[in-house]
């Protein structure tokens, strides 16, 4: 019971870095000596000290003979920071409780081996599911080579996204649209389509988040400014031009194309060519490519065509649906364009994770049955 109690505190600490640690995972560490917390820390940002180092420095000499509760296996290799295993030994930690092993197959288990080799008792698996949950994207990218993929949608209660003439501003309330900004800021990349850019001309940036109390706490803990997600526009027909709003906004933007054009693009715009025999953008190739850029979490914001294409590939891990108390009717545009299924067993299936009322609207979060 003590291990669970202290690991919960370590996981709570880890969450403080949720807006700033990517591509690294969120990690927290609590150091306990004689049932007293003598040190604590969390990983704040890539390139900065790991959680264990902050906790050890705050504990000082009191770390000798203590137990360290860490939400992820401590590193044993030299990277941007020295290995945490060495520091744990140097400070005299006698026992380490680890929520879960590092999912990176190249290093998984190495930290545990190092600790045991140097005489430290190790316990593994305390609140493992909870630790994985706060790092879903990192774990998925490391184990499958594909980031965690979220699809954001907004609809009426009859599942319609726009009137037949295309008008959709605004189906949901200001509060719901404000909440979308918080969904964006927790994403490493936003995928959209040229169709969406041509029709709505959106910015696809994070904005208007400063009024959120929880966000302010996270920013205070991180001591840094939020970075914008990488914007990824699928533009197989080269229809996006330097005049579109999203292009004029600062922050890295990928134009995913079959071939490049001769436009003069700003330095933050990168044309990425994904060509194949079908002359279409392969969405699996796209998300695998984004994983190589160390992107853990992808948010899709697009119309029914692209949303349906991703859904058919069965790679959507999470649905985020904002539902407005409006009825648009059967002539309005649907959420998806899907085939005419003959059997219910063939349809895409998700499970409800959370339902929240935001202003006049509902926010539904659903995950696949096989998603963590």
UniProtKB/Swiss-Prot annotation:
Pathway: Cofactor biosynthesis; riboflavin biosynthesis; 5-amino-6-(D-ribitylamino)uracil from GTP: step 2/4; Cofactor biosynthesis; riboflavin biosynthesis; 5-amino-6-(D-ribitylamino)uracil from GTP: step 3/4. It comes from the Bacteria. One of its GO terms (biological process) is riboflavin biosynthetic process. Binds 1 zinc ion. Residues 1-145 are annotated as: Deaminase. NADP(+) binds at residues 154, 170, 196, 200, 236, 303-309. It catalyses: 2,5-diamino-6-hydroxy-4-(5-phosphoribosylamino)-pyrimidine + H2O + H(+) = 5-amino-6-(5-phospho-D-ribosylamino)uracil + NH4(+); 5-amino-6-(5-phospho-D-ribitylamino)uracil + NADP(+) = 5-amino-6-(5-phospho-D-ribosylamino)uracil + NADPH + H(+). Its EC number is 3.5.4.26, 1.1.1.193. Zn(2+) binds at residues 50, 75, 84. GO terms for molecular function: 5-amino-6-(5-phosphoribosylamino)uracil reductase activity; diaminohydroxyphosphoribosylaminopyrimidine deaminase activity; NADP binding; zinc ion binding. The active site is at 52 (proton donor). Its cofactor is Zn(2+). Substrate binds at residues 168, 184, 204, 207, 301. Residues 1-122 form the CMP/dCMP-type deaminase domain. Pfam families: dCMP_cyt_deam_1, RibD_C. Keywords: Hydrolase, Metal-binding, Multifunctional enzyme, NADP, Oxidoreductase, Riboflavin biosynthesis, Zinc. Residues 146-372 are annotated as: Reductase. InterPro entries: APOBEC/CMP_deaminase_Zn-bd (IPR016192), CMP_dCMP_dom (IPR002125), Cytidine_deaminase-like (IPR016193), DHFR-like_dom_sf (IPR024072), Eubact_RibD (IPR004794), RibD_C (IPR011549), RibDG_C (IPR002734), Riboflavin_Biosynth_HTPR (IPR050765). PANTHER family: 2,5-DIAMINO-6-RIBOSYLAMINO-4(3H)-PYRIMIDINONE 5'-PHOSPHATE REDUCTASE, DIHYDROFOLATE REDUCTASE FAMILY PROTEIN (AFU_ORTHOLOGUE AFUA_8G06820). In the N-terminal section; belongs to the cytidine and deoxycytidylate deaminase family. Converts 2,5-diamino-6-(ribosylamino)-4(3h)-pyrimidinone 5'-phosphate into 5-amino-6-(ribosylamino)-2,4(1h,3h)-pyrimidinedione 5'-phosphate. This is Riboflavin biosynthesis protein RibD.
């Amino acid at each position: 019971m003590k291990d669970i109690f202290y690991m919960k505190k370590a996981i709570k600490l880890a969450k403080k870095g949720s807006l700033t640690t990517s591509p690294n995972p969120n990690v927290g560490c609590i150091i306990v000596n004689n049932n007293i917390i003598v040190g604590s820390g969390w990983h704040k940002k890539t390139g900065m000290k790991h959680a264990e180092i902050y906790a050890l420095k705050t504990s000082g000499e009191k770390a000798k003979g203590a137990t360290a509760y860490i939400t992820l296996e401590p590193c044993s290799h030299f990277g941007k920071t020295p290995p945490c295993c060495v520091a744990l030994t140097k400070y005299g930690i006698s026992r380490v409780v680890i929520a879960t092993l590092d999912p990176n197959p190249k290093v998984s288990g190495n930290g545990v081996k190092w600790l045991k080799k140097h005489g430290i008792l190790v316990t593994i698996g305390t609140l493992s599911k909870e630790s994985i949950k706060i790092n879903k994207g990192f774990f998925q990218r490391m184990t499958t080579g594909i980031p965690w993929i979220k699809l954001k949608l907004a609809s009426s209660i009859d599942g319609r996204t726009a009137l037949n003439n295309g008008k959709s501003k605004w189906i949901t309330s200001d509060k719901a649209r404000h909440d979308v900004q918080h969904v964006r800021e927790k994403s490493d990349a936003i995928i959209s389509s040229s169709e969406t850019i041509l029709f709505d001309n959106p910015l696809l940036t994070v904005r208007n988040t400063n009024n959120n109390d929880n966000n302010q706490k996270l920013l205070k803990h991180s001591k840094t400014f939020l970075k914008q997600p990488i914007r990824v526009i699928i533009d197989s027909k080269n229809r996006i031009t330097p005049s579109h709003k999203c292009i004029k906004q600062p922050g890295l933007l990928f134009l995913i194309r079959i071939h490049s054009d001769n436009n003069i693009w700003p330095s933050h715009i990168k044309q990425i060519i994904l060509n194949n025999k079908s002359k279409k953008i392969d969405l699996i190739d796209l998300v695998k490519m984004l994983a190589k850029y160390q992107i853990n979490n992808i948010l899709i914001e697009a119309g029914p065509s692209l949303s349906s294409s991703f859904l058919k590939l069965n790679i959507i891990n999470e649905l985020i649906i904002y539902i407005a108390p409006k009825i648009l009717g059967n002539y309005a545009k649907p959420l998806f364009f899907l085939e005419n299924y003959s059997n219910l067993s063939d349809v895409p299936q998700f499970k409800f994770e959370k339902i929240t009322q935001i202003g006049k609207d509902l926010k539904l979060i659903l995950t696949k049955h096989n998603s963590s």
